[in-house]
Design a protein with these regions (language model features):
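Serine endopeptidase catalytic core focused on the charge-relay Asp
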Residues: 50, 54-55, 85-86
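Non-catalytic accessory segments of DNA primases and related replication-initiation nucleases
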Residues: 1-52
Length: 170
């Protein structure tokens, strides 16, 4: 009948939901593999990158370094800082691709990428007693932990403005 909306086909809905679930599981496996392949950040070009940006605080174990992280847009492996995103139902990471000497971000597009669904999660860069401070980016959060905040605080990076809006607070 003309003008009446057609109800969605239950089989098509089920197919799309199964596809979305399979994709989420695949991305979670990829994120977990990326995290496991990465090494502690100390004495790596990821630490060099952060120190060159004036970050002086102790670097958290939520940050690691991957010497050959996959960059899908260019189909090649590039050094990257890998950050674990917590507070989510599935495992996810954020990658910042770096120049080989750690002097800055890699000259790639994009030079930052998320793997897995990150909305609602955050990277804890400092877990001290005190207020919760939420920043958009990892470097901003680390800068706050490097002395811009005058008292102890828990500092999170929500990764984007929409990430801040979706953040699940304790």
């Amino acid at each position: 009948i003309e003008g009446k909306p057609v109800p969605p086909d239950p089989a098509e809905i089920a197919r799309r939901e199964a596809e979305a679930c399979a994709d989420a599981e695949k991305r979670e496996r990829q994120a977990l593999a990326c995290w496991r392949e990465a090494q502690p950040i100390g004495s790596t070009i990821a630490e060099t990158y952060l120190r060159n940006r004036g970050i002086t605080c102790e670097l958290p174990d939520t940050l690691r370094f991957h010497p050959e992280c996959w960059h899908g847009a260019t189909a090649r492996r590039v050094p990257a800082m890998v950050a674990r995103v917590d507070g989510l139902p599935r495992f996810a990471v954020h990658r910042t691709y770096l120049r080989p000497d750690g002097s800055g971000k890699a000259d790639l597009t994009p030079n930052k990428a998320m793997l897995g669904r990150t909305a609602g999660g955050a990277i804890c860069v400092c877990d001290e007693p005190g207020p919760l401070v939420v920043a958009e980016g990892i470097e901003t959060a680390l800068s706050l932990s490097s002395g811009l905040i005058r008292r102890p605080a828990t500092v999170w990076a929500a990764l984007s403005a929409p990430g801040i809006a979706a953040l699940q607070l304790p």
